[in-house]
Amino acid sequence: MERSSIFQPKRFVKVFAVLLPLLFNGYSVSGANPTEAPVAQHTEVTANAAESAHVAEAGAAHGAEGHGEEKAGDVIMHHILDSNVIAFDPFGEVDLPKIVVAGFDISITKHVVMLWVVSAIVIALFAAANGQYKTGSAMRAPKGIANALEALVDFIRLDVAKANIGKGYEKYLPYLLTVFFFILVCNLLGLVPYGATATGNINVTLTLATFTFFLTQAAALKAHGIKGYLAHLTGGTHPALWIIMIPIEFIGLFTKPVALTIRLFANMTAGHIVILSLIFISFILKSYIVAVVMSVPFSIFIYLLELFVAFLQAFIFTMLSALFIGLASAHEGGHDEHEASAAHH
């Protein structure tokens, strides 16, 4: 049956075989701490000793406050940025190996480990769901995780892939499903204690967008051939305008993957910065009232909002990928309809 074939782990493993090279990509992270300001220079002794002492005390208080804000900012950046250390506060931390080959940093970093974990989780989930379909009756509704996965798979298959690509959507479905669940688990893992949001790393989002870009161009070449693909770069204009249209159309090929990259990266990074900033407000102001009235309630609200954003961003990336594939492979009859749909989104 069609439903049973969707849950074959082999289909997802094949796509992961293409996606997994990004897991070995090293990310260079600047871990340098800001240098502390030098000690206040020696000042002349004046007759008014009381005024000098007051000025010195005020300066020291201002310096301590600035140092506290700077330290809070360092902690926030430490949780957002990639690193060669996985912290398990208060139990300690694990140093990850640094690997440099021919001058290229391919070190195993925190986000690389998270990508490995996400890959294992996605494969395990669908392997478990496939096991239920093999052992259960075809007439019996799936239960538990298999039921939830089937609902999401049907949604991506019908409302995303089929709706945006149309005829022949089946051959792109394994990629779209893999991208959706991969991004979703990446986003959710960043909300778990000791986890990290790999999709908050622009290297990861750029790699995912690059896969969509190449798949889109392959779909265009298959649908229109070399001649039709190159003719699209001229935009159907007079040859005198080709010198203008070709560069514009060529640049336009790369605006879509860049938009995918920035959209996912910015949204997943911004939410975590807001949560951590709200938490640290109470520490900076040293006020329990601020913590109870503002920091904690707003942090919980933003955290719940992040759960929604995790699903939303996975859906948007997958939907736009399907839309770009549909635009690239659409023939002249359906081109205007796809263009109108793209403009609407």
UniProtKB/Swiss-Prot annotation:
SUPFAM superfamilies: F1F0 ATP synthase subunit A (SSF81336). One of its GO terms (cellular component) is plasma membrane. Keywords: ATP synthesis, Cell inner membrane, Cell membrane, CF(0), Hydrogen ion transport, Ion transport, Membrane, Transmembrane, Transmembrane helix, Transport. InterPro entries: ATP_synth_F0_asu, ATP_synth_F0_asu_AS, ATP_synth_F0_asu_bact/mt, F0_ATP_A_sf. Belongs to the ATPase A chain family. This is ATP synthase subunit a. HAMAP family: ATP_synth_a_bact. It is a multi-pass membrane protein.
